[in-house]
Design a protein with these regions (language model features):
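Short, intrinsically disordered, charge-balanced linker/junction segments flanking boundaries
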Residues: 1, 186-188
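Glycine-/small-residue-rich active-site loops that bind phosphorylated ligands and cofactors
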Residues: 22-23, 41, 75-78, 180-184
Length: 188
């Protein structure tokens, strides 16, 4: 708490209770550190169903949670319409649910699939019910490192471009950093 008060003075501390859920484990990003993904067509590949989301969301509400953190792989067949439909359905079933979903690499992937722009994709998702954008997939924003551990994801520059686009449409974002692997202290 002393460190927090040094950086963020004041007596108010907030947090949110959320639930992580994966939209799909199908991914073609080939991250070296991922034990989660499956190739398209793999027998263990899945896309989470609405019934599975209902169970997870209702459990989240039972425990006082209010937000669903949705992440997933770079599925080659799940474009913008899939996520727009998913977000609309989840919000129609649970209007008070906060959707903190996808991340810059997923937005970049969808943008590429659609031949669109980051702003167009983010705006469509926001209109469908996306409340905020998690900062997943940053790993380390060094392209040297990214080429070695997650070369199928967007560049560090594109990750930042997606975040800038989100901020232009007044979307709240967060950011994460994965460190302690092959990066140098300077790259941190």
């Amino acid at each position: 708490n002393q460190i927090r008060q040094h950086h963020v003075p004041g007596k108010t501390v907030t947090w949110i209770i959320d639930r992580n859920s994966n939209t799909t484990n199908v991914c073609n990003a080939n991250c070296k550190f991922c034990n989660f993904y499956r190739r398209p067509g793999h027998e263990e590949a899945y896309i989470t169903t609405i019934d599975e989301y209902k169970i997870k969301i209702e459990e989240t509400f039972e425990y006082g949670g209010e937000q669903l953190l949705l992440q997933g792989g770079h599925h080659p067949d799940l474009g913008l319409s899939f996520y727009v439909d998913l977000f609309k359905e989840l919000k129609s079933l649970y209007p008070n649910l906060k959707l903190h979903a996808l991340g810059p690499p997923e937005i970049a992937h969808i943008t590429k699939l659609e031949g669109s722009t980051h702003i167009e994709v983010l705006t469509a998702l926001q209109e469908a019910g996306l409340d905020s954008l998690p900062g997943a997939g940053a790993e380390i924003l060094s392209d040297r490192v990214r080429r070695l551990i997650s070369k199928g994801k967007c560049s560090g520059k594109e990750w930042l471009d997606v975040m800038r686009a989100a901020h232009k449409i007044d979307m709240t974002t967060s950011a994460t950093m994965m460190f302690g692997h092959i990066e140098t202290n300077t790259e941190r």
